[in-house]
Amino acid sequence: MAVTLDSPSPARKRRPLVVGSFESPKLSSDTKLTRSLFLASHEISSMQPLPFILRRNSLSLIRKVKILASVFDELLLPRSQLVVYSQSAHLCFEEMQIVMQRIKSLIDDCSRVSKLWLLLQIDIVAFNFHELVTDLSTVLDILPLHDFDLSDDAQDLISLLTKQCSDSVQFVDARDVALRRKVTDTIAGIKHQISPDHSTLIKIFNDLGLSDSASLTDEIQRLEDEIQDQIDDRSKSAAASLIGLVRYSKCVLYGPSTPAPDFRRHQSLSDANIPADFRCPITLELMRDPVVVATGQTYDRESIDLWIQSGHNTCPKTGQVLKHTSLVPNRALKNLIVLWCRDQKIPFELYGDGGGEPAPCKEAVEFTKMMVSFLIEKLSVADSNGVVFELRALAKSDTVARACIAEAGAIPKLVRYLATECPSLQINAVTTILNLSILEQNKTRIMETDGALNGVIEVLRSGATWEAKANAAATLFSLAGVSAYRRRLGRKARVVSGLVDLAKQGPTSSKRDALVAILNLVAERENVGRFVEAGVMGAAGDAFQELPEEAVAVVEAVVRRGGLMAVSAAFSLIRLLGEVMREGADTTRESAAATLVTMCRKGGSELVAEMAAIPGIERVIWEMIGAGTARGGRKAASLMRYLRRWAAGDTHNTAAETQSIVVPTPSRIFSPVL
C-alpha cells in the first residue's frame, strides 16, 4: 500500500505526537506562578528548532515564547510591595502555564520520534503547532495588561506578539511536502517491484539528516518503537514499510554493518525478575500467549491447553469446574508483557509463527526480498563477516525476513562459515542459523541441508568462543522443538556429550543454554538414558548454585522420564534438592519437591531415609504446604506422607499412591538473538 495522510493518525498507546491536556500545578502565590512561567519560557527559548522537518513551524513558536520570556523577566524584577494579581490575571497566567507545557511537550515529542514517521505526519503536526499559537493568542487577547506594572516596551512586545499570533495561519513547508511525496512514491514503486534509484535514496535521507549507517540504524530503532506504539494494523503496516525502506537503503548505500567487538546477546529471561502477574500460574514462567478461562483466571495458552487435553475439567488455580473450555486471548496483558520485555531489553516474539500476526504489507515484503538478494550476492566477496552480521540482524527482526533469507538459499552459504577460524564470523554464522530456526519450516531446511547439523554440532563441541558454543546449543534447542528431530538429535553421541560438557565447563550464560537444550531433548524418553550415561546429573548438580531453576528442571525431567538408573544417578542430589526447597524461588521449590516425590515413588525407603536425614526437612515441607504454590503444596503433602510412612516403618510399599499432576515441561520463551 502507498502511505497516505488523508486522515489523522490513529490513537496510540503512549503519549501521541499531538498536543494534549495538562493540569496546571498548584502554586501558592502570584510570584511563584510568574517565576514558573519565567522558567518555562526560558526553557522553551533555549530549545533548538526541529532541524530538518517542520523547522519553520517550531522556530516561529520558539521565537514567540522568547518574547514572552523577556516580559516575565521584567515581571520578576524586585518590587517594593507584594505582587498580587487580579483573579482574571491569575487565571490567564495559569492557562498560559498549560500552553507552555504543551509547547515543550510537542517539540520534545517531535525531536524524539522517527524522522520518517514525522514526515508522514507533517499535516497533523503542523496543525498542532498552529493550534498552540491560536491558544496562546486567545490567552493574550484576554490578558488584563493594566493589572501589571509593565514598561511601555514590554506592553509593545505583548501587543506585537498578540498581533503575530492572531495573524498566524497553518503552514506546511513545500519542501517537506515534496520530500514526503518522494518517500511515498518510492514505497509505492516497491509494490510493483521497481527498485529505488540510489541517488533518490541519498537525497531523501540527506534531507532528513540521516547520512550514515549509524543514523539509519537509530532510525530503524525509532520506527520499531513506533510499531509497538501503534494500535491499528494500517499504521503498523505503514511503519513496517518505512523500516523496510531504511533497512534496504542502509545496506545498499553504506554496505553491511560490522559488529562492535563487545557485541553481545540481549539479556535473557533467566536474568530478569519477572513480575508475578506475567507468570503462568501453572509453569510460573513468562506467558507468551496469555488466555482467560471460564473462571476468569489467566494462563499461558500452551500450558492450559495441555492441562485441558490431559482430561482435567477444573481451573488449576481455583479448583472450580470449568463451565466451558473456550480460551479468550488476554490482549491487554500481552501488550503489557511485550512492553515490559522491551523495557528490559529482552527480545520477545509478539506473535507465534502460527497466526495472530497481521499480514505483512507487500511493500515491506518486497523491501526485505530486495535486501536479502543484495546480501546473498555479497556473500561471495571478501568482507563476508559484515554481510553475515547483516543477515543475522535481519533474521532477528521478523518472520518474513526469516522466510525470505531461507528461501533465497542462505543456509548452505552460511554452513561454510561454521568452520571458519575467524571467531566473530563463526558467531555471526551460527547465530544467523539460530534465528532462522525459529520459523517452523526453516527447521526442516536446516536439518535437510548438507553439513548444517554437523556444522552446528562441531561449533558446540569445539567452537572458537563460549558465545558460539552457547548459540549452537540454543540452535539445537530450537531444532528439538520438532519431536522427530528431538529423537534424531538425541541419538547423536556428539550432541549429548557436547551439551553435557558445555553445562559442566561453560560460563553461566553458556551453561544456561546447554541446560535448556538438554531439558528439551530429555522430553523424549529414549534420550534420557544417554544423557544419564554422559553425566548429566553431575553437570546439573554443579549448576545448582548458579542456575537453580534450569538445573532442578533438568533433574526433574530426567528422573520423571528415566528409570531406576536415573533415580540412582540423582541420589547424590537429594540434599541439594532439599536446600532448594528451603531457599529457592517458587518455581524451583516446587520443581525440587516434584523431583523428590518421583524419586521416593521409584526408589523406595532408602531414598526416603536419605531425604529424612536432611536437617529441618519437615519444617520446610510444612512451609511449602502452607505458603507455597498450589502445585508445590500438593507435592509437599505427598513428601510428608512418604516421611510419615517411613517413620512408621511401612517399608513394604513406601511408594504409595501419589496424586498425578499433569504439568507441561518447563519451556523457554525462545527469542531471536541479535
From Swiss-Prot:
GO terms for biological process: protein ubiquitination. ARM repeats lie at residues 399-438, 441-481, 484-523. It is an enzyme of class 2 (transferase). Residues 273-347 form the U-box domain. It catalyses: S-ubiquitinyl-[E2 ubiquitin-conjugating enzyme]-L-cysteine + [acceptor protein]-L-lysine = [E2 ubiquitin-conjugating enzyme]-L-cysteine + N(6)-ubiquitinyl-[acceptor protein]-L-lysine. Keywords: Repeat, Transferase, Ubl conjugation pathway. Coiled coil: none annotated. SUPFAM superfamilies: ARM repeat (SSF48371), RING/U-box (SSF57850). Its EC number is 2.3.2.27. Pathway: Protein modification; protein ubiquitination. Functions as an E3 ubiquitin ligase. This is U-box domain-containing protein 16. The gene is PUB16.
